[in-house]
């Protein structure tokens, strides 16, 4: 599915076949207009082909609030960061990187709570069931 198509577009870019990557991603995105993976792959391909205006339009289509990175739009935030780096907008790139870093810290906290449990698990340190 989408993962395989995303990888194919990345391989095309890595091989320097930017126009082919753009064409592939364009067709994929046109078939799946709501698919953020298709859109993100397309943004990366457009950046590789230096088609910055089209890349920016796609980014704004999927990122409405640049201060809110969520699980659903994280990959587009990463593409947007790369886009702003490519066009030399250091301020905007730094802003998005900060939001991404905050999101990563949030995810790390969630994982930590899930794996280690929170302090509110009902056990006092001195009354653990395995002591």
Regions flagged by a language model, labelled:
Residues 8, 42, 79-83:
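Structural register within alpha-helical repeat arrays
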Residues 15, 49, 86-87:
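Structural motif corresponding to the intra-repeat A-B loop/turn of tetratricopeptide repeats
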Residues 27-28, 62, 66, 100:
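Canonical positions in the second alpha-helix
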């Amino acid at each position: 599915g989408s993962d395989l198509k995303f990888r194919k577009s990345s391989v095309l870019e890595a091989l320097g076949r930017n126009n082919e990557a753009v064409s592939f991603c364009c067709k994929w995105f046109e078939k799946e207009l709501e698919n953020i993976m298709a859109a993100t792959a397309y943004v990366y391909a457009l950046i590789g082909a230096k088609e910055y205006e089209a890349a920016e339009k796609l980014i704004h289509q999927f990122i409405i609030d640049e201060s809110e990175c969520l699980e659903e739009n994280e990959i587009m935030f990463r593409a947007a960061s790369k886009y702003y780096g490519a066009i030399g907008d250091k301020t905007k790139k730094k802003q998005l990187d900060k939001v991404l870093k905050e999101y990563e810290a949030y995810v790390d906290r969630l994982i930590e709570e899930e794996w280690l449990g929170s302090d509110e698990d009902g056990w006092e340190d001195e009354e653990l069931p395995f002591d």
